[in-house]
UniProtKB/Swiss-Prot annotation:
Zinc phosphodiesterase, which displays mitochondrial tRNA 3'-processing endonuclease activity. Involved in tRNA maturation, by removing a 3'-trailer from precursor tRNA. Associates with mitochondrial DNA complexes at the nucleoids to initiate RNA processing and ribosome assembly. It comes from Macaca fascicularis. Residues 208-224, 808-820 have a biased composition (Basic and acidic residues). Belongs to the RNase Z family. One of its GO terms (biological process) is mitochondrial tRNA 3'-end processing. This is Zinc phosphodiesterase ELAC protein 2. The gene is ELAC2.
Length: 826
């Protein structure tokens, strides 16, 4: 054991010495882990809601400005609570990037059951669960509870977090910071006798009515999780919920110096009841003299109110204007409204009725507008990294689109501010706009930063020389197919890598998506800008590999935005072909029943029917498969089951011209994928984890970098693109010794065609120079992990040796004892 301790000490010394050479920060003492329930315990100590005397600091902050790619979302902060108003796709990613702590969210308020408001909610809830948050209160339209049931179809049971749903008809909600009142508002355009729209009793699984007459069989019916209703639902697009939020009274601050001047016993136990009395507004008597509360305290803050209202179209204007609850806060109200947040299009803001309603709040009320006319960069890190990558290769790493404000809004007679990402309005201690946190996107600054990195310019020059000196291609390859990586990260959207989505542009007017994680449309929009409608109009199909949230929760927004794009292009609407596990039907059906009509958007081909040897009993499915092959000009679209979760698929696309693209989805190394992908032109394979984490890869059913490369080599793939990296490799993964001239790594917004295969591996040296600091940190973490593994292995071996050595010694003692006696006897 002494030798073992000595060995461990020497190994530790060597590694720590190396660590300090790489980064002096590694020698720092690690902080103890935080208690995940510390916030809850702090709240319990404060006592009942509203008894704390009011928050000292309260502000609203814009998370998303209402633009087409980001939706509208607000974050409200106090030292006691955190709130989120609306949670569309990408909100979690923005909060993570801009350090708005997700783990502290007490409440989520939803103004409408529309995908632009709830598209990121499923991912947000899963993240809150993982952070250990014990409870989150959700408020909004009546369909909210059914929506939370529906997401269990792909999330599984949401154990470990209590999701308390507050009905829109419930009385006010009160906590330590404020009281929130919900105001249901119904549009004038409600059909019939003003009853919520009833969804048709369409059988579960029949997605496109015009195509579903003979497309179903009993085996294709998806099974819903326990507790998820199969009954038809009641969705009500005519309902929005507005919120009036009233801050609690904040008692005045005790003036210590003034108290000393008046001879009060400051610094003794006797001062406590005096402070309590004057903060409650009571006078006190000291040495025969009456002292008024205002002599010892600053004036109390009665607590301002703010309003969050969504007015989606002109049909809601009159009901909003006539609402009696709003009227109580207008004019000479007892509780003045400091701020009204308007989630409303320009057509609503231009309506004279709505303008008059805004004016009735008075000249001292500020107004914040969130809509598609707001211009703001949200994903700053994404813009930064793309600008720097563009220096290496402008075609493979094209610049992202920036969006100026589209047009001047209507002239209003009230104080109006257009939303910008991270713009703040402080309600307490002083009411004011704060613009210091607003994002500014400065490409010149990003470029200068990259050019000053050690060896970056030299590595770029070396790459360009090697590209010029390399052998000329035997033949010029076509621009198509063109592969655009929209999301290359795994699990959750992060600041530099979004979750899975890859666009395959088969031709200038035909494309398909391989997986469609949350925020896919936003990535498309930032990549293509004003051309996004053209791209959506050319989208022929979507392949969903499996039902994990990071692979399919962007589908609904793609469907809705595609309908809008076809209308703007003047093209006839037709359902989108979706190749997916059958279980996706249950999710689409539930969302259709409770929230929005979406079933008419989809013609679904169960992925199992595209496996080799699959029997297709439905003529309708056969027709859809034929349509898929014809539209995409494919000879074959094949799927196979891969080694991940249940019903997880990979796919292979064989074009009529002969090229073959294979997509792994999520999987461990898989023989079925190797066989399906034989002689592929391009393999896109997940490489979630670095080499050395093979056990973790098995536990999580993913692949390491070298495992993915070996799959491609066994497949005899012409080229391998690695993607789906763990978010621990935020900017760049660790490079494996197995990297060669046939391997490249994918980045978000990277664009490659087959003619780029010789170029992509040559990008690795400048990439290493650009991300040298990140690579050093990852290598340091790997060294520490390897040291822990060596320690554990040596300790285990030493303990085993001790156990094995102990028994023979005892046996020898027993067997040698008689012999020694004989010797002594002689």
């Amino acid at each position: 054991m002494w030798a073992l301790c000595s060995l461990l000490r020497s190994a530790t010394g060597r590694t720590m010495s190396q660590g300090r050479t790489i980064s002096q920060g590694s020698a720092r003492r690690q902080r103890p882990p935080k208690d995940p329930l510390r916030h809850l315990r702090t709240r319990e100590k404060r006592g009942p809601s509203g008894s704390s005397g009011g928050a000292n600091t309260v502000y609203l902050q814009v998370v998303a400005v209402g633009s087409r790619d980001a939706g509208a979302a607000l974050y409200v902060f106090s030292e006691f609570n955190r709130y989120l108003f609306n949670c569309g796709e990408g909100v979690q990613r923005l909060m993570q990037e801009h350090k708005l702590k997700v783990a502290r969210l007490d409440n989520i308020f939803l103004t409408r059951m529309h995908w632009s408001n709830v598209g990121g909610l499923s991912g947000m809830i899963l993240t809150l669960k993982e952070t250990g948050l014990p409870k989150c209160v959700l408020s909004g339209p009546p369909q909210l509870e059914k929506y939370l049931e529906a997401i269990k179809i792909f999330s599984g049971p949401l154990k470990g977090i209590e999701l308390a749903v507050r009905p829109h008809s419930a009385p006010e909600y009160k906590d330590e910071t404020m009281t929130v009142y919900q105001i249901p508002i119904h549009s004038e355009q409600r059909s019939g006798k003003h009853q919520p729209w009833q969804s048709p009793e369409r059988p579960l699984g029949r997605l496109s009515p015009e195509r579903s007459s003979d497309s179903e069989s009993n085996e294709s019916e998806p099974h819903l999780p326990r507790g998820v209703s199969q009954r038809r639902g009641v969705r009500d697009p005519s309902l929005v919920v507005a919120f009036i939020c009233k801050l609690h009274l904040k008692r005045g601050s005790f003036l210590v110096l003034k108290a000393k001047e008046l001879g009060l016993p400051v610094g003794t136990a006797a001062i406590a009841p005096i402070i309590a009395a004057v903060k409650d507004g009571k006078s006190i008597t000291h040495e025969g003299r009456e002292i008024l509360a205002e002599e010892l305290c600053t004036p109390p803050d009665p607590g301002a109110a703010f309003v969050v209202v969504e007015c989606p179209d002109e049909g809601f204007i009159q009901p909003i204007c006539e609402n009696a609850t709003f009227q109580r806060y207008q004019g000479k109200a007892d509780a003045p409204v400091a701020l009204v947040v308007h989630m409303a299009p320009e057509s609503v803001l231009a309506d004279s009725r709505y303008q008059q309603w805004m004016e009735r709040f008075g000249p001292d009320t500020q107004h914040l507008v969130l809509n598609e006319n707001c211009a703001s960069v949200h994903n700053l890190r994404s813009y930064k990294i793309q600008t720097q990558l563009n220096l290496i290769h402008p075609d493979i790493f094209p610049l992202l689109t920036s969006f100026p404000r589209k047009k001047e809004g209507p002239t209003l007679s009230v104080p109006v501010v257009q939303g910008e990402c991270l713009l703040k309005y402080q309600l307490r201690p002083r009411r004011e706009w704060q613009r210091d946190a607003i994002i500014t996107c400065n490409p010149e600054e990003f470029i200068d930063e990259a050019l000053q990195l050690p060896n970056f310019q030299e590595s770029m020059q070396e790459y360009r020389r090697s590209a010029q000196d390399g052998p000329a291609p035997a033949e010029k390859r076509s621009q198509y197919p063109e592969i655009v990586f929209l999301g290359t990260g795994s699990a959750v959207p992060m600041k530099t890598r979004n979750v899975s989505a890859t666009l395959v542009n088969i031709s200038p007017d035909t494309s398909l998506l391989l997986d469609c994680g949350e925020g896919t449309f936003g990535q498309l929009y930032r990549h293509y800008g004003d051309q996004v409608d053209r791209v959506l109009g050319s989208l022929a199909a979507v392949f969903v590999s499996h039902l994990h949230a990071d692979h399919h929760t962007g589908l609904l927004n793609i469907l809705l935005q595609r309908e809008r794009a076809l209308a703007s292009l003047g093209k006839p609407f037709h359902p989108l072909l979706v190749v997916a596990p059958t279980q996706l039907k249950a999710w689409l059906q539930q969302y259709h029943n409770q929230c929005q009509e979406v079933l008419h958007h989809v013609s679904m081909i169960p992925a199992k029917y595209l496996q080799v040897g699959a029997e297709i009993s439905s003529p309708a499915v056969e027709r859809l498969i034929s349509s898929l092959l014809r539209t995409c000009d494919l000879e074959e679209f094949q799927t196979c089951l891969v080694r991940h979760c249940r019903h997880a698929f990979g796919c292979a696309l064989v074009h009529t011209s002969g090229w073959k693209v294979v997509y792994s989805g999520d999987t461990m190394p898989c023989e079925a994928l190797v066989q399906m992908g034989k002689d592929a032109t391009l393999l896109i394979h997940e490489a979630t984890l670095e080499d050395g984490l093979e056990e973790e890869a098995v536990e999580k059913t993913h692949s390491t970098t070298s495992q993915a490369i070996r799959v491609g080599m066994r497949m005899n793939a012409e080229f391998i693109m690695l993607n789906h990296f763990s978010q621990r490799y935020a900017k760049v993964p660790l490079f494996s010794p197995d990297f060669n001239e046939k391997v490249g790594i994918a980045f978000d917004h990277m664009k490659v065609s087959f003619g780029d295969f010789p170029t992509v591996p040559k990008l690795i040296p400048p990439l290493k120079a650009l991300f040298a600091g990140d690579i050093e940190e990852m290598e340091e973490r790997r060294e520490k992990r390897e040291l822990r593994q060596v320690r554990a292995a040596l300790l285990s071996r030493a303990l085993t040796d001790d156990l094995e050595d102990g028994e023979p010694q005892q046996k020898r003692a027993h067997t040698e004892e008689p012999q020694s006696k004989k010797v002594r006897a002689q």
